[in-house]
Every structure is written in structure tokens, then in C-alpha cells.
Amino acid sequence: AFAEAAVDQVEPIFRSGLGAQPARFKGQGDFATEVDLVIEQQLRDILTQMTGIPVYGEESGGSVLDTVWVVDPIDGTANYSAGNPLAGILVALIHKGAPVVAVSDFPLLGRRLVTCDGSPLRSVGGPATGFGGGEDAMGFDEARGHVGCSSHLPTEIFHELRETGLRPRMTGSVGLDNAFVAQGVFDGAINFSPHPWDNAAGALQIQTAGGVVTDPEGNPWTAQSRGLVAGTPQVHATIVDILSRHSGSFHR
């Protein structure tokens, strides 16, 4: 409830700032807008005041303590700055290295996913989940094989994914890729981000929906993992198998 209330308060800032220009460059084409900075500070203030738990944010730092909030004020900043609506707000509570509360909000798409450990996934906008359900459920289609991935994916891995029949898709937002897996829009996702604010929310949401979530080597995902592979059992296994043959090309 605290995480969702905090997101509710910053969502109007997110909506009104679409197209904001870079304000801080972080290297290798990465940057933050003034909206990133404002939203993160507000999330930090709100969550700390409400819960007393420290916040680890993309723009202002922190550390992965025993219990900590991790926030990405704008996941997909390059999209957002260009006026592309494929961007969102990610908030997760990590306890002993694992996410236990998660909110992924995509205001410009009208989609939000919310869950906490032990509770079902709540999905607003789009299908609730592709896992389980009856024959008529909006679901994962392993024959379709859509896999969210980033432009940092090595070329040889990209091509091998295609050769197995999977279909890589690049949204420009790690958080959206993960949310799409939880909703059943994508059948899998892969990224090599070492940052917990990118993957913590999605990891919990996909697991809650019944998907498989690991690091790129196939180990359980934790806040210290350097990347994430997720999806249906079949798609996840296919991706991990491909990565096992190319491990030297994605360790950064």
C-alpha cells in the first residue's frame, strides 16, 4: 500500500514531463532528466516518511541493505525524453536480497502491476497474467516466442535466439519487458543489468504470475544478480541454454 501510494503521488509529474530533455549525463549515452531527479527525490521522501525504510535510487544512490526500497523514477529515460510512452516508474522493497513488494507503473500506457510476497498479481490494463487459467485465458503462447531484450544484447546471442524460433523485441525499457512477461504479452525477457532497481519489481511480479526467474547463469535472482532471464519454463530454459554457450560475451 505504501509503494502504490507513493507512485500515485508522483504519477502526475511523470505524465506532465514527457519529452523532458537530458539534465545529467552518466556516460555511454545514459542520462537523467530533471523529471527523473524530482520523482526520485519525492519517492525517497514519501517512502522514508511512511515506512522509515531507506531508499536506494538510480539517480541518487544508496546501498542494498538488509531491508531497502529500490526505485527507478523513470525506467526507459531515453524513450521518455524522446516523447515515447514506453517508460515507467519502478518501486520494490527488498528484504535479505529478495523483492517482497513490487509496483511497476506505466502511466502513459495505462498499465500497472502490483504484488507483494504471498499475494496474487494485480494487473491494471492489459491481461492479468498468461500463466494458468482456462483455455480462454489471455496467455503465454510459446509458439509465438516474443522475448524482450535490450540493445546491449550481443549480436551472436540475438541471432541464436532467432534461430531457435524465438522473436526478440526491444522496447527500450527493462521494466516494461519484465511487466510484459508477467502479463503474458511476452513469453520471456533477458537483460544484463546489474542494478536492482531495474529488475527487482519485475522479478517478483513474474514469479507471482507463475513464471521462472533467474540470473543469466540460471541461479535464483537476487538483488546482487548481474542480469535477469525470465519467462515460461520452455522459453526460459531455451534462453539459459543459449547463454551458457556465450557466457564470455555478456559478463561486464
List each language-model region with its residue ranges.
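An extended, acidic
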Residues: 135-252
